[in-house]
Amino acid sequence: MYRRSYVFQTRKEQYEHADEASRAAEPERPADEGWAGATSLAALQGLGERVAAHVQRARALEQRHAGLRRQLDAFQRLGELAGPEDALARQVESNRQRVRDLEAERARLERQGTEAQRALDEFRSKYENECECQLLLKEMLERLNKEADEALLHNLRLQLEAQFLQDDISAAKDRHKKNLLEVQTYISILQQIIHTTPPASIVTSGMREEKLLTEREVAALRSQLEEGREVLSHLQAQRVELQAQTTTLEQAIKSAHECYDDEIQLYNEQIETLRKEIEETERVLEKSSYDCRQLAVAQQTLKNELDRYHRIIEIEGNRLTSAFIETPIPLFTQSHGVSLSTGSGGKDLTRALQDITAAKPRQKALPKNVPRRKEIITKDKTNGALEDAPLKGLEDTKLVQVVLKEESESKFESESKEVSPLTQEGAPEDVPDGGQISKGFGKLYRKVKEKVRSPKEPETPTELYTKERHVLVTGDANYVDPRFYVSSITAKGGVAVSVAEDSVLYDGQVEPSPESPKPPLENGQVGLQEKEDGQPIDQQPIDKEIEPDGAELEGPEEKREGEERDEESRRPCAMVTPGAEEPSIPEPPKPAADQDGAEVLGTRSRSLPEKGPPKALAYKTVEVVESIEKISTESIQTYEETAVIVETMIGKTKSDKKKSGEKSS
């Protein structure tokens, strides 16, 4: 989130001429000429007072002329010294060189990223080929496993069949043995019958028939027994063949398993190696992409800084040109007792410039993931005003405050929140130290101011009454005051322009009570609070009286030291300017009485010169303060630079000022 606060202060100091005081002090002459002898002494005294007043006025003019002559000599000597533009130019040149180096580094990283992408593609293609080969091997292994399972099932089936056949063979053997025993028993019985029976022709013929039948049966039984033996031998041969086939299949399956196990282990090792290489390549690619993103962010930040430096140089160049060329003489309000220390002033200026140019770079580190807001608003008041002994100075102050708030939030991806900070090889990257540069410019400014500043003189307490008007502006727009010109500022946030005008108080006027102005709305919205008759609020100058704040009486050195302490403590600095409050705190609307008593800006600008004495000398002090806040997360690094505070004083007569106001309107 970037915040820029521009505080423009304008002061007017008016001085009455001594002739008015003398005319006011001059007594009226009596009308009667007969009293000439009595009033001659009074006339002589009045003439003596007038002569003394003219002599005193001549002395004051002579002192003022001497002070202006010393200021002119001081500015001529300052013109010979080297200004802060050289330091800024060198800083800009170094930043440009840094940008060129970063661009070369980015190109190198892009080439490395391209090579890494090409290597990743090659590894991916190899990995895909290996995956395809692995799939083919897996399919082949599955097919072989299926064939082995089928062979095992077929072997089991053959074993079962062989077992059944073995059972059948054993049953047939038992049956044939029983049949053989029965046949032998029959033969033995027949032989006994033949031996025991008497020979007879009938018995012999019958026995022969039975013997023939029995021999036939024995032959049939022997043929059956031979067939059973042949079947048994055939089954035994099949059994031996099946056992041999089973053994061969078991050996083939075992060798295939061993071979495929070795190949699968080898392929698994290759796949694991390729996976590790791919993971390493992905990590390298992720790191390269992270480096590229970091370089892109750093390049964008450096471009923004270069643009800001260009704008600062252009603005300060224009302001210094207008201050030193157009109206360089009445730049300081004090003209009494100007003392210049040339002995140590040059050394101090040289040392301040060396501090600016030799600002050491600081290490760029990632802060915590907590955005911090820091707003630095610095006010610098002039140390003293010109006080003449017989003259009574009436001060008329005009305060213009412009607060420009620019807020931008960056959203990143969720994965960038967990990314560790970038660690590069070699020494860490250095960035310009804007704080030291700003402190150096502040020191240079104080040295120059102390060199040409006149010593403080006791001031008589002056009564300060301010009147203020708020005008809210949004977008690319600006507010133009007839007496003060504000350049157009590209406003991405809300712009609040506060104009406070002082009126010259004469004797008998009553001091009004101070009131607080209405703060501008948030988020850059235009607060158009209209009256009952429909007139917008930005055309109604609201008169408010503001008491001088005690903080404004501090010197510029104390304020610079306070600002440095605030920058070191990194705490947001509260706004202490009179007539302005925190823009984030809403306030109840203004009463209708103040709105009814307001007048149009043109009428006010025309009526203001009539209040002060004619031919009054006016001084104008413009102070620009810019503070840029740092945004940081764990994945993005930015730079923090504080702005350069430059104060210029432009002196014009009231007639020239009125002409410039009419041109701006």
Curated annotation (Swiss-Prot):
Chief location bin: membrane
Residue list for modification Phosphoserine: 5, 341, 420, 513, 665
Keyword Cytoplasm: yes
GO MF entries: structural constituent of cytoskeleton; structural constituent of eye lens
InterPro entries tied to this protein: BFSP1, IF_rod_dom
Name by which UniProt lists this protein: Filensin
Cross-referenced PANTHER family: FILENSIN (PTHR14069:SF0)
Variant or mutagenesis effect after changing residue 433 to A: Abolishes cleavage by CASP2
Source organism, top-level taxon: Eukaryota
Name of one Pfam family that matches: Filament
Function: Required for the correct formation of lens intermediate filaments as part of a complex composed of BFSP1, BFSP2 and CRYAA. Involved in altering the calcium regulation of MIP water permeability.
Region of interest (Head), ranges: 1-40
Basic and acidic residues biased stretches: 556-571
Region Coil 1B, annotated ranges: 85-184
